[in-house]
């Protein structure tokens, strides 16, 4: 039985503009891929034929933020990529929604103690649906899209624009969704660690074997001043050992 056959007068269907527009929007989502780490592989797998994302009306991934209405953030959000993510979000037309896919996009995941990792995408842009997992399977992302469709179905936004605070100032920097202290750390490029994470001393650097001074280590990036101290310490150690060897030969 078709939809029109359920009514006595098949030529007329009474509904509200909200329901009509929401029905069209939820069944014609244009996702914008914002893959940052390993969760992006599962996001790409969701668009493959064996998952058939098109049956939910969201199978066409937009190539431009100006043609998209759903941003899927999958992966670790660093302070460097936070600026790019916010600019892409600002370029998306209203109405727009955001899906945070994976533990890293939700709360930082296993990398939340990194110096440049934000505790989730919702620190800089508003998130509508969270899809947990490390990484979540394609079925989980599909369920997240279905959850977003249910949310869109209940929205009322015809005739007005949903209020969204400005996320970027005149210079293109993140403002609204970050505390002043955290924004200052990001803008100055300083190390950022969430509350409760003990900050490692900047003077002590654990160097991996086989890597030159100044490269990535087990604890992260080496600050320039610590890098110089590390080089100076190694040079002093080498000269000291040479003096000791000369002393032994003289004895």
Curated annotation (Swiss-Prot):
GO terms for biological process: aerobic respiration; electron transport coupled proton transport. Coiled coil: none annotated. It catalyses: a quinone + NADH + 5 H(+)(in) = a quinol + NAD(+) + 4 H(+)(out). GO terms for molecular function: 4 iron, 4 sulfur cluster binding; iron ion binding; NADH dehydrogenase (ubiquinone) activity; NADH:ubiquinone reductase (non-electrogenic) activity; quinone binding. Its EC number is 7.1.1.-. It is found in: Cell membrane. Keywords: 4Fe-4S, Cell membrane, Iron, Iron-sulfur, Membrane, Metal-binding, NAD, Quinone, Translocase, Transport. [4Fe-4S] cluster binds at residues 38-39, 104, 134. It is an enzyme of class 7 (translocase). It is a peripheral membrane protein. Residues 242-251 have a biased composition (Basic and acidic residues). Belongs to the complex I 20 kDa subunit family. HAMAP family: NDH1_NuoB. NDH-1 shuttles electrons from NADH, via FMN and iron-sulfur (Fe-S) centers, to quinones in the respiratory chain. The immediate electron acceptor for the enzyme in this species is believed to be a menaquinone. Couples the redox reaction to proton translocation (for every two electrons transferred, four hydrogen ions are translocated across the cytoplasmic membrane), and thus conserves the redox energy in a proton gradient. PANTHER family: NADH DEHYDROGENASE (PTHR11995), NADH DEHYDROGENASE [UBIQUINONE] IRON-SULFUR PROTEIN 7, MITOCHONDRIAL (PTHR11995:SF14). This is NADH-quinone oxidoreductase subunit B. It comes from Rubrobacter xylanophilus (strain DSM 9941 / JCM 11954 / NBRC 16129 / PRD-1). The gene is nuoB.
